[in-house]
Amino acid sequence: AIVTKPKPEALPFWTESLDKVIADVASKTTDDANKILIDNKPEDAMPLLIKLAAKKQGDERNAIIARFLLTAEHTATSGDLMYLLLRDADELTTDDYIRQRIIVALGYTHCPQAISYLRKYYGNKAYADALAVATTELIAYQPEANAGRMVSAMLYAAKQSYIHHYDEKDVDTRIDQVLAAIDNWHAEGGYNMAHTEVTRMEKRGFWVIHDQLADFNLAFDWLSEGTLTLSIRSMPVLMFNKEKGLKLVGDSKWHKYDTIGDWSTANISVNGDNITVSVNGQKLIDGTKLVATESGDPINKQGYIKFLADEQGATVREYCFLRK
Protein backbone atom coordinates (compact mmCIF):
# COMPACT_ATOMS: atom_id res chain seq x y z
CA ALA A 1 0.00 0.00 0.00
CA ILE A 2 1.12 3.55 -0.72
CA VAL A 3 1.57 5.47 2.49
CA THR A 4 0.71 9.13 2.09
CA LYS A 5 2.53 11.26 4.58
CA PRO A 6 0.28 13.70 6.40
CA LYS A 7 0.83 17.26 5.19
CA PRO A 8 2.97 19.03 7.79
CA GLU A 9 1.10 21.55 9.92
CA ALA A 10 1.79 25.05 8.57
CA LEU A 11 3.87 27.27 10.79
CA PRO A 12 2.13 30.34 12.15
CA PHE A 13 2.58 33.45 10.00
CA TRP A 14 5.65 35.40 11.22
CA THR A 15 3.58 38.30 12.61
CA GLU A 16 2.37 36.01 15.43
CA SER A 17 5.84 35.80 16.95
CA LEU A 18 6.22 39.57 16.46
CA ASP A 19 2.99 40.08 18.41
CA LYS A 20 4.40 37.98 21.27
CA VAL A 21 7.53 40.15 21.39
CA ILE A 22 5.40 43.32 21.49
CA ALA A 23 3.19 41.89 24.26
CA ASP A 24 6.31 41.02 26.24
CA VAL A 25 7.73 44.56 25.89
CA ALA A 26 4.32 46.04 26.78
CA SER A 27 4.16 43.98 29.98
CA LYS A 28 6.90 46.22 31.41
CA THR A 29 4.74 49.36 31.16
CA THR A 30 5.26 51.89 33.95
CA ASP A 31 2.57 52.78 36.51
CA ASP A 32 1.84 56.20 35.01
CA ALA A 33 1.04 54.56 31.65
CA ASN A 34 -1.16 51.95 33.33
CA LYS A 35 -3.03 54.74 35.12
CA ILE A 36 -3.80 56.40 31.77
CA LEU A 37 -5.34 53.13 30.58
CA ILE A 38 -7.41 52.73 33.73
CA ASP A 39 -8.69 56.32 33.70
CA ASN A 40 -9.51 56.69 29.99
CA LYS A 41 -11.36 54.98 27.16
CA PRO A 42 -8.86 53.28 24.79
CA GLU A 43 -9.50 55.92 22.06
CA ASP A 44 -8.63 58.73 24.49
CA ALA A 45 -5.75 56.83 26.09
CA MET A 46 -3.79 56.43 22.84
CA PRO A 47 -2.71 60.06 22.28
CA LEU A 48 -1.96 60.36 26.02
CA LEU A 49 0.30 57.30 25.84
CA ILE A 50 2.20 58.82 22.90
CA LYS A 51 2.65 62.09 24.83
CA LEU A 52 3.92 60.16 27.86
CA ALA A 53 6.28 58.06 25.71
CA ALA A 54 7.83 61.27 24.36
CA LYS A 55 8.86 62.20 27.92
CA LYS A 56 10.52 58.83 28.61
CA GLN A 57 13.61 57.15 27.22
CA GLY A 58 14.95 53.73 26.31
CA ASP A 59 13.07 50.67 27.59
CA GLU A 60 10.41 52.73 29.41
CA ARG A 61 9.54 54.56 26.20
CA ASN A 62 9.44 51.33 24.18
CA ALA A 63 7.17 49.65 26.73
CA ILE A 64 4.67 52.52 26.47
CA ILE A 65 4.73 52.46 22.65
CA ALA A 66 4.22 48.67 22.71
CA ARG A 67 1.25 49.17 25.06
CA PHE A 68 -0.10 51.83 22.69
CA LEU A 69 0.12 49.35 19.78
CA LEU A 70 -1.81 46.69 21.73
CA THR A 71 -4.43 49.27 22.75
CA ALA A 72 -4.79 50.45 19.13
CA GLU A 73 -6.02 47.00 18.06
CA HIS A 74 -9.14 47.35 20.19
CA THR A 75 -10.40 50.79 19.17
CA ALA A 76 -12.73 52.13 16.52
CA THR A 77 -10.42 55.09 15.81
CA SER A 78 -10.50 56.16 12.13
CA GLY A 79 -7.66 55.06 9.87
CA ASP A 80 -6.61 58.69 9.37
CA LEU A 81 -6.27 59.43 13.09
CA MET A 82 -4.50 56.11 13.59
CA TYR A 83 -2.06 57.02 10.81
CA LEU A 84 -1.17 60.26 12.64
CA LEU A 85 -0.66 58.45 15.96
CA LEU A 86 1.42 55.68 14.37
CA ARG A 87 3.67 58.26 12.70
CA ASP A 88 4.27 59.89 16.07
CA ALA A 89 5.05 56.47 17.56
CA ASP A 90 7.43 55.70 14.68
CA GLU A 91 9.34 58.92 15.27
CA LEU A 92 9.75 58.05 18.97
CA THR A 93 10.93 54.43 18.80
CA THR A 94 14.43 53.10 18.16
CA ASP A 95 13.37 49.45 18.49
CA ASP A 96 13.24 47.35 15.29
CA TYR A 97 10.48 45.01 16.53
CA ILE A 98 8.27 47.93 17.49
CA ARG A 99 8.95 49.63 14.16
CA GLN A 100 7.94 46.46 12.28
CA ARG A 101 4.68 46.39 14.23
CA ILE A 102 4.07 50.08 13.46
CA ILE A 103 4.66 49.48 9.73
CA VAL A 104 2.17 46.57 9.72
CA ALA A 105 -0.39 48.72 11.57
CA LEU A 106 0.08 51.58 9.08
CA GLY A 107 -1.06 49.15 6.36
CA TYR A 108 -4.43 48.79 8.07
CA THR A 109 -5.06 52.57 8.09
CA HIS A 110 -5.95 52.30 4.37
CA CYS A 111 -4.96 55.90 3.58
CA PRO A 112 -2.78 57.17 0.71
CA GLN A 113 -0.72 59.21 3.18
CA ALA A 114 0.47 55.90 4.67
CA ILE A 115 1.69 54.63 1.26
CA SER A 116 3.63 57.85 0.81
CA TYR A 117 5.13 57.71 4.32
CA LEU A 118 6.11 54.03 4.17
CA ARG A 119 8.17 54.45 0.98
CA LYS A 120 11.12 55.45 3.16
CA TYR A 121 11.38 51.87 4.48
CA TYR A 122 11.50 50.33 1.00
CA GLY A 123 14.81 48.53 0.44
CA ASN A 124 15.54 48.25 4.16
CA LYS A 125 16.04 44.53 4.92
CA ALA A 126 14.98 44.81 8.57
CA TYR A 127 11.50 45.99 7.54
CA ALA A 128 10.95 44.09 4.27
CA ASP A 129 8.46 41.59 5.74
CA ALA A 130 6.48 44.24 7.62
CA LEU A 131 6.37 46.43 4.52
CA ALA A 132 5.09 43.46 2.48
CA VAL A 133 2.04 43.08 4.75
CA ALA A 134 1.41 46.84 4.81
CA THR A 135 1.77 47.33 1.04
CA THR A 136 -0.53 44.41 0.19
CA GLU A 137 -3.20 45.74 2.55
CA LEU A 138 -2.92 49.38 1.41
CA ILE A 139 -3.15 48.55 -2.30
CA ALA A 140 -5.99 46.02 -1.81
CA TYR A 141 -8.11 48.76 -0.24
CA GLN A 142 -7.06 51.52 -2.66
CA PRO A 143 -6.85 49.99 -6.13
CA GLU A 144 -6.69 53.54 -7.57
CA ALA A 145 -3.26 53.92 -5.91
CA ASN A 146 -1.93 50.83 -7.73
CA ALA A 147 0.24 52.63 -10.28
CA GLY A 148 3.67 54.11 -10.79
CA ARG A 149 7.18 52.71 -10.43
CA MET A 150 7.46 52.93 -6.65
CA VAL A 151 4.26 50.97 -5.97
CA SER A 152 5.38 48.33 -8.49
CA ALA A 153 8.73 47.95 -6.72
CA MET A 154 6.97 47.64 -3.34
CA LEU A 155 4.59 44.96 -4.67
CA TYR A 156 7.45 42.88 -6.14
CA ALA A 157 9.34 43.17 -2.84
CA ALA A 158 6.18 41.99 -1.03
CA LYS A 159 5.98 38.95 -3.33
CA GLN A 160 9.62 38.08 -2.47
CA SER A 161 8.90 38.40 1.24
CA TYR A 162 5.96 36.00 1.04
CA ILE A 163 8.04 33.49 -0.94
CA HIS A 164 10.55 33.45 1.95
CA HIS A 165 7.66 32.61 4.29
CA TYR A 166 6.07 30.02 1.96
CA ASP A 167 5.67 27.35 4.69
CA GLU A 168 3.66 29.63 6.98
CA LYS A 169 -0.08 29.77 7.49
CA ASP A 170 -2.23 31.49 4.82
CA VAL A 171 0.77 32.73 2.85
CA ASP A 172 -0.78 31.37 -0.37
CA THR A 173 -3.71 33.78 0.13
CA ARG A 174 -1.29 36.68 0.57
CA ILE A 175 0.70 35.67 -2.52
CA ASP A 176 -2.54 35.49 -4.55
CA GLN A 177 -3.45 38.95 -3.29
CA VAL A 178 -0.10 40.45 -4.25
CA LEU A 179 -0.06 38.70 -7.67
CA ALA A 180 -3.52 40.11 -8.39
CA ALA A 181 -2.26 43.58 -7.46
CA ILE A 182 0.78 43.16 -9.75
CA ASP A 183 -1.60 42.10 -12.59
CA ASN A 184 -3.79 45.16 -12.05
CA TRP A 185 -0.91 47.63 -11.80
CA HIS A 186 -0.71 50.58 -14.25
CA ALA A 187 2.43 52.44 -15.30
CA GLU A 188 0.56 55.76 -15.45
CA GLY A 189 -1.68 57.24 -12.77
CA GLY A 190 -1.77 56.52 -9.08
CA TYR A 191 -0.78 59.10 -6.49
CA ASN A 192 1.84 61.65 -7.48
CA MET A 193 4.27 61.69 -4.54
CA ALA A 194 6.81 64.19 -5.88
CA HIS A 195 6.01 66.85 -3.25
CA THR A 196 5.68 64.87 -0.02
CA GLU A 197 8.58 66.49 1.88
CA VAL A 198 7.92 68.59 5.00
CA THR A 199 7.30 72.13 3.72
CA ARG A 200 7.33 75.03 6.17
CA MET A 201 5.59 78.34 5.45
CA GLU A 202 6.59 81.25 7.66
CA LYS A 203 4.24 84.11 8.62
CA ARG A 204 1.90 84.74 5.66
CA GLY A 205 4.01 82.35 3.61
CA PHE A 206 2.58 80.31 0.76
CA TRP A 207 3.37 77.24 -1.30
CA VAL A 208 2.11 76.82 -4.88
CA ILE A 209 2.19 73.37 -6.49
CA HIS A 210 2.05 74.09 -10.21
CA ASP A 211 0.41 70.88 -11.51
CA GLN A 212 -2.78 71.92 -13.32
CA LEU A 213 -5.55 69.86 -11.73
CA ALA A 214 -9.21 69.58 -12.76
CA ASP A 215 -10.72 66.48 -11.09
CA PHE A 216 -8.53 64.81 -8.47
CA ASN A 217 -8.03 63.27 -5.05
CA LEU A 218 -5.67 65.10 -2.72
CA ALA A 219 -4.18 64.09 0.62
CA PHE A 220 -1.88 65.98 2.99
CA ASP A 221 -1.05 66.52 6.67
CA TRP A 222 -0.67 69.97 8.16
CA LEU A 223 0.38 71.67 11.36
CA SER A 224 -0.73 75.21 12.20
CA GLU A 225 -1.80 77.19 15.26
CA GLY A 226 -3.71 79.59 13.00
CA THR A 227 -5.72 79.29 9.78
CA LEU A 228 -4.46 77.54 6.66
CA THR A 229 -6.19 78.50 3.39
CA LEU A 230 -6.20 76.06 0.48
CA SER A 231 -6.69 77.19 -3.11
CA ILE A 232 -8.06 74.63 -5.56
CA ARG A 233 -8.13 75.29 -9.33
CA SER A 234 -6.29 78.55 -8.55
CA MET A 235 -9.14 79.84 -6.32
CA PRO A 236 -9.23 80.04 -2.49
CA VAL A 237 -11.71 77.30 -1.51
CA LEU A 238 -11.08 75.90 2.00
CA MET A 239 -9.99 77.26 5.39
CA PHE A 240 -8.64 74.93 8.10
CA ASN A 241 -8.41 76.03 11.73
CA LYS A 242 -7.62 73.71 14.66
CA GLU A 243 -9.96 75.55 17.06
CA LYS A 244 -12.85 76.42 14.73
CA GLY A 245 -12.75 73.57 12.22
CA LEU A 246 -13.08 73.62 8.43
CA LYS A 247 -15.09 75.94 6.21
CA LEU A 248 -15.60 76.82 2.58
CA VAL A 249 -14.31 80.30 1.72
CA GLY A 250 -17.31 82.64 1.53
CA ASP A 251 -19.40 80.42 3.84
CA SER A 252 -19.96 81.40 7.47
CA LYS A 253 -20.36 77.86 8.88
CA TRP A 254 -17.35 76.12 10.43
CA HIS A 255 -17.41 72.29 10.58
CA LYS A 256 -15.71 70.99 13.73
CA TYR A 257 -13.36 67.99 13.60
CA ASP A 258 -11.54 65.89 16.20
CA THR A 259 -7.82 66.35 16.71
CA ILE A 260 -5.45 64.16 18.70
CA GLY A 261 -2.17 66.02 18.54
CA ASP A 262 -0.41 68.79 16.70
CA TRP A 263 -0.91 67.41 13.20
CA SER A 264 -4.13 66.86 11.25
CA THR A 265 -4.66 65.10 7.93
CA ALA A 266 -7.07 65.83 5.07
CA ASN A 267 -8.48 63.92 2.11
CA ILE A 268 -10.13 65.99 -0.60
CA SER A 269 -11.92 64.86 -3.73
CA VAL A 270 -13.03 67.14 -6.58
CA ASN A 271 -15.39 65.73 -9.24
CA GLY A 272 -16.86 68.07 -11.83
CA ASP A 273 -17.62 71.16 -9.77
CA ASN A 274 -18.31 69.29 -6.53
CA ILE A 275 -15.98 68.92 -3.56
CA THR A 276 -15.86 66.36 -0.74
CA VAL A 277 -13.57 66.86 2.26
CA SER A 278 -12.64 64.64 5.20
CA VAL A 279 -10.41 65.78 8.06
CA ASN A 280 -8.91 63.21 10.43
CA GLY A 281 -11.29 60.61 9.02
CA GLN A 282 -14.48 62.67 9.49
CA LYS A 283 -16.41 63.59 6.32
CA LEU A 284 -17.28 67.28 6.79
CA ILE A 285 -18.21 68.42 3.27
CA ASP A 286 -19.93 65.96 0.97
CA GLY A 287 -20.34 66.76 -2.73
CA THR A 288 -20.88 70.50 -2.17
CA LYS A 289 -20.81 72.67 -5.31
CA LEU A 290 -17.66 74.75 -5.76
CA VAL A 291 -18.50 78.44 -5.90
CA ALA A 292 -16.23 81.15 -7.31
CA THR A 293 -15.40 83.55 -4.48
CA GLU A 294 -15.87 86.72 -6.54
CA SER A 295 -19.61 86.51 -7.14
CA GLY A 296 -20.60 86.06 -10.74
CA ASP A 297 -17.24 84.67 -11.87
CA PRO A 298 -17.38 81.28 -13.58
CA ILE A 299 -15.48 78.52 -11.79
CA ASN A 300 -12.06 77.65 -13.16
CA LYS A 301 -12.17 74.25 -14.84
CA GLN A 302 -8.61 73.54 -13.72
CA GLY A 303 -5.75 75.26 -11.94
CA TYR A 304 -2.99 74.98 -9.35
CA ILE A 305 -3.09 74.09 -5.66
CA LYS A 306 -1.84 76.71 -3.21
CA PHE A 307 -1.40 76.66 0.57
CA LEU A 308 -1.47 80.04 2.33
CA ALA A 309 -0.50 80.47 5.99
CA ASP A 310 -1.63 83.33 8.24
CA GLU A 311 0.42 85.23 10.86
CA GLN A 312 1.14 81.95 12.67
CA GLY A 313 2.78 80.15 9.75
CA ALA A 314 2.05 76.51 8.84
CA THR A 315 3.74 73.24 7.88
CA VAL A 316 2.51 70.71 5.30
CA ARG A 317 3.81 67.17 4.69
CA GLU A 318 2.87 64.05 2.69
CA TYR A 319 1.14 66.12 -0.02
CA CYS A 320 0.06 63.70 -2.75
CA PHE A 321 -2.55 63.86 -5.49
CA LEU A 322 -4.24 61.58 -7.98
CA ARG A 323 -5.62 62.91 -11.27
CA LYS A 324 -8.99 61.58 -12.37
Named regions from a protein language model:
Residues 24, 92, 161-165:
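Helix-loop junctions that connect tandem helical modules in alpha-solenoid scaffolds
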Residues 173, 180-324:
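Carbohydrate-interacting regions of secretory-pathway proteins
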Residues 14-22, 48-50, 81-89, 117-119, ...:
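Buried hydrophobic core positions in alpha-solenoid tandem helical repeats
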Residues 71, 124-128, 133-137, 244-245, ...:
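Beta-propeller blade termini and top-face loops
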Residues 17-25, 191-196:
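Disulfide-bonded cysteine-rich modules in secreted/extracellular proteins
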Residues 1-12, 20, 29-42, 51-54, ...:
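Structural detector for internal amphipathic alpha-helices that build alpha-solenoid repeat scaffolds
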Residues 59-77, 142-145, 193, 221-224, ...:
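Mid-chain, structured segments of secreted extracytoplasmic proteins
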